[in-house]
Amino acid sequence: MTETTSAKPKKVSKPKAKPTHPPTSVMVMAAIKALKERNGSSLPAIKKYIAANYKVDVVKNAHFIKKALKSLVEKKKLVQTKGAGASGSFKLAAAAKAEKPKAVAKPKKAKTPKKKAAATKKPTGEKKAKTPKKKPAAKKPAAAKPKKAKTPKKKAAPAKKTPVKKVKKTSPKKKAAPKKK
């Protein structure tokens, strides 16, 4: 009797395709670094940079870009010079600039007093800690990726802008010179 019961075949889950771009927060930070604007980079400027340098549909990922900006401001990696929320201008925080040199300096100090074996163990622990953080960030863009098939339609829509009609300037007709009597 166990043979007569039909078992449903298990659905084979397809492995999620890895996104062709880094996490949104990394792209936003790179955009602000590259733009180097004195008063901070605006949201449209950041989107324009991301669209030009990464294979990302900015219209569909606008939500993720805004979310990344807000979270980076909360983490104090960015400073909002103008506006509120995700609008306005953003600069790299002084703390974010100073963190990178400190992070490089700390492992060097740790290696000198300890044995080589202990020093090699530390970087492996750091790598293990970093990998789980990257995976959740990669899942979010992967969920948005299947929607990319629709992008050509949206890109075509802005291209259909109505041409601006050029107004021809008609020069005033010269009046015939009055006949001499």
UniProtKB/Swiss-Prot annotation:
GO terms for molecular function: double-stranded DNA binding; nucleosomal DNA binding; structural constituent of chromatin. Keywords: Chromosome, DNA-binding, Nucleus. SUPFAM superfamilies: Winged helix' DNA-binding domain (SSF46785). Residues 20-94 form the H15 domain. Residues 8-19, 103-119, 145-181 have a biased composition (Basic residues). It is found in: Nucleus; Chromosome. One of its GO terms (biological process) is chromosome condensation. It holds the Pfam family Linker_histone. Its main location: nucleus. Residues 1-23, 81-181 are annotated as: Disordered. GO terms for cellular component: nucleosome; nucleus. Histones H1 are necessary for the condensation of nucleosome chains into higher-order structures. Belongs to the histone H1/H5 family. This is Histone H1. It comes from Tigriopus californicus (Marine copepod). The lineage of its organism: Eukaryota, Metazoa, Ecdysozoa, Arthropoda, Crustacea.
